[in-house]
Amino acid sequence: MSINKNIARLRRAKSTRSHIRDLGVARLSVLRTGQHLYAQVFTADGSKVIAAANTLQADVKDGLKNGKNSDAAVKVGKLIAERAKAAGIEKVAFDRSGYRYHGRIKALADAAREGGLQF
């Protein structure tokens, strides 16, 4: 990813996080790398992580060839929904961190919705 492209993504992410902070609800944040996918649920003020899931965890890795495809994103989405609900979080704002709502990001969001999270 070029520097300018990454700076633009971070600028979009900053704007989105500002709007989410004004809503006052928990935030489901996604980080995408070339090899893995990470998801975290933060408190409404962003000071504490309530739940987390990623493709490095053993329960997600089982049965996957790699952690960078949509199948892995679906597993992470279901797992983050399960963990957030166990922590008492039902409603979240989806923070895609400036990434396009497409591919792995969309697969994770759809799986989290199916898991019971409301965006």
Swiss-Prot record:
Q: Which SUPFAM superfamilies match?
A: Translational machinery components
Q: Keywords for this entry? A: Ribonucleoprotein, Ribosomal protein, RNA-binding, rRNA-binding
Function according to Swiss-Prot or TrEMBL: This is one of the proteins that bind and probably mediate the attachment of the 5S RNA into the large ribosomal subunit, where it forms part of the central protuberance.
**Keyword Membrane tagged:** no
Kindly list the GO molecular function terms attached to this UniProt entry. Answer: 5S rRNA binding; structural constituent of ribosome
* GO terms for biological process, alphabetical: translation
Q: What is this protein called?
A: Large ribosomal subunit protein uL18
What's in the GO CC field? cytosolic large ribosomal subunit
Q: Which Pfam families match?
A: Ribosomal_L18p
Q: Which residues form a coiled coil?
A: none
Q: What family name appears in the similarity comment?
A: Belongs to the universal ribosomal protein uL18 family.
Q: Does the record bear Disulfide bond in its keywords?
A: no
This protein's assembly is summarised as:
Part of the 50S ribosomal subunit; part of the 5S rRNA/L5/L18/L25 subcomplex. Contacts the 5S and 23S rRNAs.
Q: Name the CDD domains on file.
A: Ribosomal_L18_L5e
